[in-house]
Amino acid sequence: NEEIECACDFLMDKDAQGYTDLSDLDLTSCHFKGDVISKVSFLSSNLQHVTFECKEIGDCNFTTATVDNVIFKCRRLHNVIFIKASGEYVDFSQSILDTVDFSRSQLTHSNFRECQIRNSKFNNCYLYASHFTRAEFLSDKEISFIKSNLTAVVFDHVRISTGNFKD
């Protein structure tokens, strides 16, 4: 099995809001590498086995994307939307997740190990068997897991400054 590596030029045409549109594409096994990945829309794209390797991902939208086995080797994700994204074995380990919205996502068996999670939402999520080992939840507002299914989720050696786990 040869590893497929895709290089994308982020100087492509932008939409009216200044976003590079990579929506509704099959980007399986692509490797996105660079300093900053910013203002990219991955709406409804297939991102299975994709690796993001960069210092920062900012202002990106992964709404309804398929993210099975995606690896985020990023120092920081900022203002990123994963609403209704679905995937297994997504790896966010050792990243700063700053203002990330995971609402209504299904991210089973995912890894949030040693993440710093700030001002982010996990409302109505299905996070079966995901791991938050040694994660820090730091927030001006409360971290929210309202109506989320946390069956078999591991919160081991976690620090939470303020949180909401209602219903």
PLM regions and their residue ranges:
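Tandem repeat scaffolds
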Residues: 3-167
